[in-house]
Amino acid sequence: MEVNGVSQSEAAPYVTKSSVKFRDNFWGSEDAGMDALMSRTKSSLSVLESIDEFYAKRASIEREYASKLQELAASSADIPEVGSTLNNILSMRTETGSMAKAHEEVSQQINTELRNKIREYIDQTEQQKVVAANAIEELYQKKTALEIDLSEKKDAYEYSCNKLNSYMRQTKKMTGRELDKYNLKIRQAALAVKKMDAEYRETNELLLTVTREWIDRWTEVCDAFQHIEEYRLEFLKTNMWAYANIISTACVKDDESCEKIRLTLENTNIDEDITQMIQNEGTGTTIPPLPEFNDYFKENGLNYDIDQLISKAPSYPYSSSRPSASASLASSPTRSAFRPKTSETVSSEVVSSPPTSPLHSPVKPVSNEQVEQVTEVELSIPVPSIQEAESQKPVLTGSSMRRPSVTSPTFEVAARPLTSMDVRSSHNAETEVQAIPAATDISPEVKEGKNSENAITKDNDDIILSSQLQPTATGSRSSRLSFSRHGHGSQTSLGSIKRKSIMERMGRPTSPFMGSSFSNMGSRSTSPTKEGFASNQHATGASVQSDELEDIDPRANVVLNVGPNMLSVGEAPVESTSKEEDKDVPDPIANAMAELSSSMRRRQSTSVDDEAPVSLSKTSSSTRLNGLGYHSRNTSIASDIDGVPKKSTLGAPPAAHTSAQMQRMSNSFASQTKQVFGEQRTENSARESLRHSRSNMSRSPSPMLSRRSSTLRPSFERSASSLSVRQSDVVSPAPSTRARGQSVSGQQRPSSSMSLYGEYNKSQPQLSMQRSVSPNPLGPNRRSSSVLQSQKSTSSNTSNRNNGGYSGSRPSSEMGHRYGSMSGRSMRQVSQRSTSRARSPEPTNRNSVQSKNVDPRATFTAEGEPILGYVIALYDYQAQIPEEISFQKGDTLMVLRTQEDGWWDGEIINVPNSKRGLFPSNFVQTV
């Protein structure tokens, strides 16, 4: 019998060995046994695959282990041993190499003997499974089809029978023609029942035959699957046995290698190894002699009693501890190095000490008891030895710091009253222990004072010579600690200088409000009362500067580099520096107190139109702040609107552009366009819209004009009210105005406001500006430089002479507002005062003045494009791209279009072959 071309004997040539048979246990309804055996065959194959993967990983481990053992055995480190110990170490290395080879063989055997056999068995089992499944698959499908057909025919047969039965029941109630009709239906139903009965019987017989064949074939398939399962289990047993043998072989080889190592170790001879090591490394048997004490005096025949010499030496009191801050100040090299100070010197220093504030009080006289106490304290300072004096002579003579005489009280630190700057300097000196390196240049004052210094130091020769046998360890230590604080220590102290910023090294505050340049930092004085102190400080300024290159403070004003354009932001124009503020560091707490007091003063004020009270309040407040040692620039913090103080960040940089400002700027540009094409546009409206767009722009972070605007603020605030009141008046400038200012202030007031508002003065020369009392008048040298710079600024702005009084004051205010140093609150105060004056009973005069000073420039270009306004260049600018234009300082440009990013579109006027292009708005000033 053949099924699918495979004979029954070939399909099931299996003989089972187990007493339990699959044929007796895999039956059931709907052939459930067949599904169980098929799933078992699949799972058995997956087990074989997992074992093959296990062998692969073990072979990889053995191969890696063998490789590492081989590297360990092949290490070529030198062995400083001899004899049997060397043989033992070499044997261990050799046997380790043998173990590596054994494990390499284990890896190869696992791959060849175990894994290959598993792959072969998997292939063979799959073939047997396919043969057994094919032998029963067709019969299984035929049996399933007959079962379905038999079920359908059975249903049809039962339906026909039920129909015939219903007809027969209905005929009992019918007669006549209706009975004849039902008899016809009964006949047809009987024929259908007969037909369905024949088909049902035939299908049943066929299914019976197929089922019997299926039983026989399934029995054979069960035997085949049982044979496959028995063989698989036997194969796994054999394969894993071989695995154990292979691993055991490797272990045996490892044990053999270990046994060889043990045999080598048994041959170790320690005596021979020691003997051979001595022969190779021995250095001799002679013991070196013991050290002996050699008495210098006995060897040279000298008979000195050291104890007696020590008792004869004079002893001076000296301190072995670290000198305090006062002792360090007293022993500063700015005093005489080796002489005690007399009472006359101390008294002269105390009496001639300069005041530390502009509003100083007279110095109280010092009594003789206080002078004696100071002299006693200074005489208790330890006197350095002659060796120290000799070692410190080059330092003192090479330094540019001169020794102050009796007539120079500004350098006497001990007698001068301490200020806040002194306290901070002393605190920094004690905490950081900084050393100031000596400068290379020597001032003329030092050269002139050499002879006097030599004469003064001769008084101390006896004391110095008498102390030459005194131990100098403690004295040199205290002297080092004293001099290291002032920059006159040894080379090692100079190497430990802490790096400081430029502003700190120059002794200047690093606040962004102090925008002075480096060139004028040491030469400018605060007031005429402090000019002597400033000149002396400038003489010693070079000595406190370090020769080494140090990092530039990020807040220092040095140079603004825009492409090839180098702008000296540290050197502000001279006209804005005629009013120099105090050089003390602005205290944040003082700024906050000034802001609070100013805001309370604003709330108490009843009207902004009262000119005299406002001017007097500002003058008195600035006077009080200057009296307390604060800067006049701090008054910008107290500037507010309608009594509401503006939030201050106390020295923080200005904020960047905000989206609201950009939106307002865009709206202003749109309204300008509508005004140009929707209604008649005048020159004044174009200029006002341009100024409005400039005022809405955020302040530039450039610190160029920080000091100029801060110095301008006090004079601007004092003259703002009088300026707004007298705009409509036409008065010729009389000398009496200047005489009044001189009689009140004592000397002519600097013309910083006049130089910055040159356009206003040029357009209306008849306008008089009433000056208030200056709290800190400047010296003649400062005033002359301001006048010269005012003339220079006036000549550079000749194109602005016809702008009117009110517009003439706008450029400088906008310039200060744009560069961020001059507070916007001060400008809003001026605008409020100007607005209040505009509502005064004299509007006709002001309008008449402005109408007379209308700029004759065109408001439209030749192509009909509207001109937004005119600007004047503050700096030189070199174009970086073809779309930009270059200009020089003083050039006048027309503005045709503005952008939110600060770049404006325009053209230089009164220049042949000029082209249109972009230029930066922070390089120009609105005319």
From Swiss-Prot:
Q: Which PROSITE patterns match?
A: F_BAR, SH3
Q: Does the keyword Cell division apply?
A: yes
**Biased segments, Basic and acidic residues type:** 444-461, 680-691
Keywords for the protein's UniProt record, in alphabetical order: Cell cycle, Cell division, Coiled coil, Cytoplasm, Cytoskeleton, Mitosis, Phosphoprotein, SH3 domain
* Phosphoserine: modified positions: 331-332, 636, 639, 700, 774
Q: Where is the composition biased (Low complexity)?
A: 321-354, 695-714, 784-813
Where the record annotates domain F-BAR, the positions are 20-273
Q: Identify the domain of life.
A: Eukaryota
Positions of the SH3 domain? 866-927
Please tell me where this protein is predominantly located: cytoplasm
Q: Phosphoprotein: is it a keyword of this entry?
A: yes
Record-listed Phosphothreonine modification sites: 529
- As recorded in UniProt, coiled-coil segments are 108-207
Return one GO MF term.
cytoskeletal protein-membrane anchor activity
Q: Compositional bias (Polar residues) spans?
A: 397-409, 465-482, 513-546, 616-625, 658-675, 718-730, 739-775, 823-853
**Biological process according to GO:** clathrin-dependent endocytosis; cytoskeleton organization; establishment of bipolar cell polarity; mitotic actomyosin contractile ring assembly
The subcellular localization recorded is:
Cytoplasm, Cytoskeleton
Concerning Pfam families, the annotation shows: FCH (PF00611), SH3_1 (PF00018)
| Record function comment | After the onset of mitosis, forms a ring-like structure which colocalizes with the medial actin ring. Appears to mediate cytoskeletal rearrangements required for cytokinesis. Essential for viability.
Q: What is this protein called?
A: Cell division control protein 15
Annotated source species? Schizosaccharomyces pombe (strain 972 / ATCC 24843) (Fission yeast)
